[in-house]
Amino acid sequence: MSTSVAYLTKRFPRLSETFILDEIIGLEDAGIPLRLYAIADPREDLVQPDVARVASPVTYLRAQGARDRARVASTTIAAHARLLARDPRRYLGIVAYIARERRHRSTLINFAQAGRLTLLVEADGARHVHAAFAHGPASVAHFVHLLSDLPYSFSAHAKDIYVSSPDLLARKIRDASFVLTCSRSAHDAITEIAGADAAKVLLAPHGVNTERFAPRPTPRDDDATLRVLCVGRLVPKKGYPVLVGAIAQLVAQGRDVACTIVGAGPERDELADLASSLGVTPHIRFLGALATTAVAASYHEADVFVQASVVLANGDRDGIPNALLEAMASGVAVVASDVAGIPEVITPECGLLVAPGDPAALADALARLHDEPELRVRMGAAARRHVIDSFDRRACTQAIAPLFQPASGVTEPARRIART
C-alpha cells in the first residue's frame, strides 16, 4: 500500500490519549494518507468507539506477548543486517554516535526498533515520518531519518519535553523538518532548547470536538448542591490530593458539594484513603475510566470542572489538558491551576485560575462559584465560545494538514502555522 506519512506513537489506541486519536482521524479526513505504527499495544479493556473510524491498520514494533518475541527479534536482527549491508558507513556512523554520546539502554532499544521500522516504512512507500511525542517515538523516528534520509517531524506536548535530555532533544530538533507544540509554554520550552533551529518549532493546539462535547440540551434542575467534576488519569501531576483537600474544606464550611472523579490510575486507593481520613468519602465518587460518550455525558451533570494540576519535581506536568477543553466546550465553568499551558486557555470570562498545590485557594474559588450560580452560567457560556473560536478540532487539524501534503513538501507550509 502506497502511503505518504508514517505516523508513529508510543501506544495505540490509548484511552487517555483522545487527542492522538482525534488528530489521526482529522488528518485522514483532510485527505492525508497515513500508515500507523505504535511502539506498543496498551491492551486496555476499554477502547474509544472512534478507533473504528481510523482507516489505517496499525503495526506494533514491540512484541505482542511471549509468542511474538521470536518473530520480532528475528525480523529486527534481519532488518539491521540489511541496513548494515546496504550502507556500512552510514550504519556504523550511527552506532558510533550512540556510543560517543553514551546514551542509555532506552536509546539502544529505540535504535533497534528504528531498524525494523525503517524497512517497514520504505516498503509502505512513506515519504515522511511523524512521531507523536518528543521522547521515545521521536527518538525512533529520528533514527529512521538517519538510517534512510526520510524527512521526519515530531510533536512535543508536556512530560515528553521536560523529562528528555536537552542535548538529545536539540539534536532531534536540528534534524527534524518541523516540530509541533500544543501550547505556548511547551513552545517556549522547546525553542529555548532549539537555539538556532527555533524557527522549526510551530505552535499547533490539539483542539477538541465541539460537536461531541456540547452543552446539555435541556437545563438540569437546580438544587443547592455544587456538582464538581474532574476527568483525568489518577497520577501525581493531576493534583487530585489538592482537590480532595479542597472538597474537605468546603464540607467543613457547611457547603453542599458532590465531587465526581472520572479516570483510572495508580493513585486510586491512596486518594480513597485520603478522602476517608478527611471524612469526605460520601462527597466523592470514583467512576474509573470511561469511554468518550460517557465522559461527554458526565460534563452535562457538572456545575464546575476542576483541573488541579501541579508540576512534579522531575519536571513532569500537563500541557493543555484535553479534559479541560472538553469541559469548556460543554459549557461548564472551570477552575484550574495557574500552571503550564492552562492559563493560555482560561480567560477571566470563562473560568478561575488558582495557585497550584493550594487546597485553600481551590476551595475559595469553588465556594465563590457555589455562592454565585449566575456566574457559573456566564462562565460556561463564555468558555464554549472561546473554545469554538480558538480550539475547534477541525480548524486545528486543517491548520497542520498542509505540513503533511505529499505534493507540497513539509517545510514551506510550516510558515503558515503560528510560531508564538
Which residues are covered by each model-predicted region?
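Acidic anion/phosphate-binding donor-loop and adjacent secondary structure
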Residues: 164-167, 191, 208-224
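Nucleotide-activated donor-binding/catalytic signature segment of Leloir-type glycosyltransferases, i.e.
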Residues: 272-293
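A conserved mid-protein helix/loop that constitutes part of the nucleotide-sugar donor-binding site
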Residues: 18, 226, 230-249, 255, ...
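Carbohydrate-associated surface elements
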Residues: 185, 207
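A short, well-ordered alpha-helix in the C-terminal region of glycosyltransferases
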Residues: 283, 361, 368, 375-390, ...
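Short hydrophobic beta-strand element within catalytic cores of glycosyltransferases
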Residues: 324, 329, 333-336
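Acidic donor-binding loop of glycosyltransferase active sites
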Residues: 300-315, 332
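Conserved acidic donor-binding segment of nucleotide-sugar-dependent glycosyltransferases
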Residues: 348-359, 368-374
